[in-house]
Amino acid sequence: METVRTDLTKRNIWRAFDIPIIIAGFLVILPILGINRTTDFAIFCIFVLAFNILYGFMGRLSFGHMLYLGTGAYAVTLFSEHISQNPLLAILAALVAGALIGVILGPIIVRTTGACFALINLAFCQVGYFLVLVAFSRYTGGEDGMSAYFSKMPLLNFGNKGVVFGFVLFCLVLAYFFLKKFTASPYGVLIRSIKENETRVKFLGYNTFNYKWITFIISTTVSAFAGALSIVNYGYVTPSFIDPSRAVEVIFAALIGGSGSLYGSIIGGVVYMAISNYLASYIPRWEMFLGFALLIVVFRFRTGVWGFITGLFTRRRDALAR
């Protein structure tokens, strides 16, 4: 009994201090990686969080999530050019655009499952890529892309990289906190039940379509949020933000960290970015070695890095309980 109580206490301590630990972790790697790269890491972690809500918690694999990242990136850029250079209003516009694309595409996409769900997302991403690259190149800048310009605000000068890093880190904590509350709610329990056995959930009287649709909208909105923050950091957008061939990046990160876990999303995002950045600096064909790393994770650590860590503590607890 004492061992179980101790384990629960440790778990509650982790849950209480998870956000300070995340902040401390990024502050630790900041002097090692530099401010630009650390900011990139934080933005990518937000994107992985958004993807994992669909894949890890609801069991729907998407090959087209770059579409929703790109939606936020282009929305914030177009807003800053044609409407207002207020950065907060531009980010808000990106959130609205992300939610809107989820509302429009959701009824079509969430009716599908398995490979069909993955491929229909990819198909829409291909369409979006064509639209920004060719069809609407007059407005999007085509292959050259376009720049975003933001006005200075009190205490929020995005021309200062330190301010950008602090703002992005705050946004990461905000996204994590929101999704943590969402997944811990009865709604979050229900979407995990849909992943395990949707037929049984329907039999209990729930309209699973509405729950899947709302979850999809949340995922697209948070993805657009990450895209908007990328433009705040980089200052320009190109079709690479919506390139379907980059879809595997967020999938790799989710698998490495551990799907179905918000902690795993952040760990996976950091590990993937660290590996890809390090290998790209020293090895010409770095993608091949990244593939080998993923194979090791899939076959050796099936639950990802976070699942492996929690598994070690679980086995230790069970050993002490004997």
Residue ranges of predicted features:
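Transmembrane alpha-helices and adjacent helix-loop boundaries
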Residues: 1-322
